[in-house]
Every structure is written in structure tokens, then in C-alpha cells.
Amino acid sequence: MLLSVASSGCMGLAMQRELMEGMRDDPREEIVPVEPIVQAHIFAQNECILPGTESYSQETDCYSNESVILVDETVSKMLLDFSVSFEWSSTVGEFLGNNTDELRFVEITLLKPNGDKCWEYLATSSVGQMALELRSESDCTISIGNSSGFTNGNWVLQVRARGYALSAPIDTLSFEDEFRVSLWVTKKCIVFPEIHSDGECTFSSELE
């Protein structure tokens, strides 16, 4: 009698375990964005010296920086967006001619791990929000590569810029040149319903 009850209890636990296993949702794959790298700058008064003046001794770009983003085989897209604000850029261009890229500019370059250029853009006037989407290296505009994905390794975002600011007694004459550049990738991410809350997942590259 005792043996029968014990056996029945063990069978009950096994059946409950199987039932619970059957009720679990299967893991699912999602494509999610990775935290972007951002380069943003607001120029201060006298930060960049106007070329041609007596005190001018700067390089052409008084802002220069680069950021690295790691790309692996799980990356499905690379996305970049940027904006540039140059007050009175059209007026300055008409007054000084077409060489305003020596005075005010933002140059954005995306480099592959081997140093080849994938994409670049030169802004010499204000630019509203613009975006670039790369689904593979075949979408590069300079050095086209792998059509089925991206080369693994460190991709580099380079930004060079020159801008100005003026704090005038009359507010309408004051201005601050500025820009913002963001680069990020989307990657495969696995959701395990039994351990992840809403919005959570584990990147597949971390499971390998």
C-alpha cells in the first residue's frame, strides 16, 4: 500500500513537470537596436579661430574625434543619422563665396575594419535630420564589399568639424553652430519567456 502511494506520487510529479515544460513558450528571435554611439558638439565663442586672422594658428578642423562600434556576424543593419545647424549659412556662403568648407563644415566618415571608406558626407550648411541605412557592405557608397553582411571587427566613425558661436547684446544676432551624429547597429536577440521580462532579451552573440 505504501509502495503504491509512493509510486503514484512520483508519477504525479513527473507528469506535472512534463505539463509545465509543455506550457513554456519557445524562445523567439527578435532584431533589436544596440545602444548608439553619439558624437555631438555645440561650438563655443572663440573655440574656433576664423582663418585669415592674425591669431589664426589652428588646423582646419578644430573639432576632430572618432568612435568605434563592434560589428559581428549577428549584425543585420547599420544605421546613421545626423543633423547640422549653421546659422545664416546661406548668407555667409553668398558673402564669402563657395569656399565655406574652410570656415564652417562637418565631415562624417564611416570606415571599415580594414580602413577603407564605406561612406562619407561633407556638410557646409545647415542640414535637417538625415539618415543612412546599410543592410550590407554592398550599400556602401565608396568601397563596396560583402553583399551578404558586414566585415567583422571595429568599424570607425570619424567626425571633423569647424564652427562658431557669438554671444551678442542683441539675442537675434547670437548663435551657436552645432551638430549631432549617431551610429548604431541592429542585432539578433533571443527572448526566453521564462526568464525575460517585456523588452528584455539576450544577444545571440553572447550565447555562442
Task: Annotate each predicted stretch with a short phrase.
Residues 1-28:
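Secretory targeting signatures
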Residues 16, 25-31, 110-112, 146-208:
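C-terminal edge strands of extracellular/lumenal beta-sandwich accessory domains
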Residues 19, 55-62, 69-70, 127, ...:
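Extracellular/mature segments of secreted proteins
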Residues 19-57, 200-205:
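Glycan-recognition and processing domains
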Residues 53-127:
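Acidic, Ser/Thr/Pro-rich low-complexity intrinsically disordered segments
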Residues 122-151:
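Beta-sandwich interaction modules
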